[in-house]
């Protein structure tokens, strides 16, 4: 049943507030969702989206005064079981599955079928397998009920979570950043599935920072800011400028802030020739000029990150040369790269970039603390000053420099990592998925930093899976396919940088068309 066929809302959250010690996370927020609707929820990190959904899912109790209605009836959701009984299911970014159990056992978790006594009887695994076959077939699952979850891909595990929600007869399905770990093809399959569930009458609450996804899926979009409800837009009135202004509370004109002047690069900074690792990168060459932003695009698995790590010296190469100016650095030496003025921002900031249990100050200073050493002792005052300057210049939202970086939002963590790299005064900066998992406001600030660095003469390489981002920030784009450079757009090629052109090069369809002619 579509929204047009059902004027009565399925879900109403009215006047919801939530206070934590010294923090008011939600302030009188309301949300209305109809059956057969994909209702997106947007806002910067810390806006209150997750808190609102945790109240709906029973993970949190709201403050007194608000109410939740389903089908017009007021209900109390005092825990996850109450939420499930009310028809609410949530699929979080971190999937909640038991990898050592089968698909059927995960679908029935907490509702196991038993032989004989329903409470104490032995678990009837065969009955559970039979009981979930229909829902797996309905969702087009490429695996059976007896498959161990540990053997499934992330996309398939996500499908198990959706199957569990459908099997419990959920009517309201919340999805929090579901495409973050997925490839483009897996994302397309997920979108088809979401639309199928909408046609079956489910209400989908979809949380994402990715504007393209919001446009593609949403029937309506509601925006939160600083714990308060800002407004709801119908699909017909959606625009990036309007959504961003609602989220950040100000107009962000020129979101990417790129001044698309005629291509006029500075002197050659970085030269990479015939670099290869023997398997994933096969003879790639590129040049980067002073003041240039070079985008590297391609499908997942094309070799973009591997190429960046080879250039940086983080992975051994079997052949090829990397020169920064007149200096050639070793085959496996990030230290040489950093000393020469080349730094790399990893795509996995939590595991490979940041020290989450250390302070913001220490994370910013750790690459340059030897500069402050005097007779074997660190100059703590200079380190504190450096951290304060970085916090101010990159607009890092933090109460003080001594807070652990693990407590910050994704966008602020990314800016801490970026500030550490900038303290080394780089000549070349490689950014691997620099805005992954960060909110709209933080994205805009990162784009500002990229463009300021380029104007100062730094050469910047941006690797991104978001095509609007690549198109928005880059002067020139290299597209990779199967470990090789498939083509170049922009720059002196005078070939427009478009999504269609990038996709054609990334998939090989352009080459296939040429061969056909």
Swiss-Prot record:
Reaction(s) catalysed (UniProt annotation): D-ribose(out) + ATP + H2O = D-ribose(in) + ADP + phosphate + H(+)
Domain ABC transporter span(s) in chain numbering: 11-251, 263-507
Keyword line: ATP-binding, Cell inner membrane, Cell membrane, Membrane, Nucleotide-binding, Repeat, Sugar transport, Translocase, Transport
EC number assigned by the record: 7.5.2.7
SMART domains linked: AAA (SM00382)
List of residues binding ATP: 43-50
This protein's record includes keyword Translocase: yes
Record-linked SUPFAM superfamilies: P-loop containing nucleoside triphosphate hydrolases
GO molecular function annotation: ABC-type D-ribose transporter activity; ATP binding; ATP hydrolysis activity
Main location group: membrane
Function: Part of the ABC transporter complex RbsABC involved in ribose import. Responsible for energy coupling to the transport system.
PANTHER family registered for this protein in UniProt: CARBOHYDRATE TRANSPORT ATP-BINDING PROTEIN MG119-RELATED, D-ALLOSE IMPORT ATP-BINDING PROTEIN ALSA-RELATED
Protein's name in the database: Ribose import ATP-binding protein RbsA 1
Taxonomic source organism: Burkholderia cenocepacia (strain HI2424)
């Amino acid at each position: 049943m579509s929204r047009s066929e059902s004027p009565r809302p399925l879900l109403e959250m009215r006047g919801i507030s939530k206070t934590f010690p010294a923090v008011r996370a939600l302030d009188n927020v309301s949300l209305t969702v109809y059956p057969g609707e994909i209702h997106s929820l947007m806002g910067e990190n810390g806006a209150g989206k997750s808190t609102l959904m945790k109240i709906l899912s029973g993970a949190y109790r709201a403050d007194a005064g608000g109410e939740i209605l389903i089908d017009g009836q007021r209900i109390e959701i005092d825990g996850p079981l109450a939420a499930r009984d009310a028809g609410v299911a949530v699929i979080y970014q971190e999937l909640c599955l038991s990898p050592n159990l089968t698909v059927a056992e995960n679908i029935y978790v907490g509702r196991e079928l038993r032989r004989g006594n329903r409470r104490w009887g032995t678990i009837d695994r065969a009955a559970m397998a039979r009981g979930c076959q229909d829902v797996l077939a309905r969702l087009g699952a490429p695996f059976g009920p007896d498959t161990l979850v540990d053997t499934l891909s992330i996309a398939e595990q996500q499908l198990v979570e959706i199957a569990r929600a459908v099997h419990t007869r959920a009517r309201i399905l919340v999805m929090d950043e579901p495409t973050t770990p997925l490839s483009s093809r897996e994302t397309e399959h997920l979108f088809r599935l979401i639309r199928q569930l909408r046609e079956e009458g489910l209400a989908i609450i979809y949380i994402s920072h990715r504007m393209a996804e919001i446009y593609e899926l949403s029937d309506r979009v509601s925006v939160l800011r600083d714990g308060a409800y800002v407004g709801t837009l119908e699909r017909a009135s959606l625009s990036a400028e309007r959504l961003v202004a609602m989220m950040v509370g100000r107009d962000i004109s020129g979101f990417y802030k790129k001044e698309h002047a005629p291509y006029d690069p500075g002197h050659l900074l970085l030269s990479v020739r015939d670099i290869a690792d023997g398997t994933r990168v096969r003879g790639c060459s590129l040049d980067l000029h002073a003041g240039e932003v070079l985008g590297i695009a391609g499908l997942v698995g094309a070799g973009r990150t591997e190429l960046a790590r080879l250039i940086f010296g983080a992975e051994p190469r079997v052949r090829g040369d990397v020169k920064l100016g007149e200096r050639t650095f070793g085959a496996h030496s990030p230290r040489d790269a950093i000393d020469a003025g080349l730094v790399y921002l990893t795509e996995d900031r939590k595991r490979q970039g940041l020290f989450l249990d250390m302070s913001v100050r220490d994370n910013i200073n750790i690459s340059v603390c030897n500069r402050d050493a005097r007779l074997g002792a660190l100059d703590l005052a200079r380190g504190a000053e450096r951290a304060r300057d970085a916090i101010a210049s990159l607009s890092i939202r933090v109460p003080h420099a001594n807070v652990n970086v693990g407590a910050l939002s994704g966008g602020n963590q990314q800016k801490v990592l970026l500030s550490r790299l900038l303290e080394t005064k780089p000549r070349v900066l490689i950014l691997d998925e620099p805005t992954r998992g960060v909110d709209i406001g933080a994205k805009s600030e990162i784009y500002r930093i990229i463009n300021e660095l380029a104007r100062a003469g730094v050469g910047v390489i941006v690797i991104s899976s978001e095509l609007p981002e690549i198109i928005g920030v880059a002067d020139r784009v290299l597209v990779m396919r199967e470990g090789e450079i498939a083509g170049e757009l922009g720059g002196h090629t005078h070939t427009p940088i478009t999504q269609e052109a990038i996709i054609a090069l990334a998939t090989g369809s352009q080459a296939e068309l040429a061969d056909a002619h």
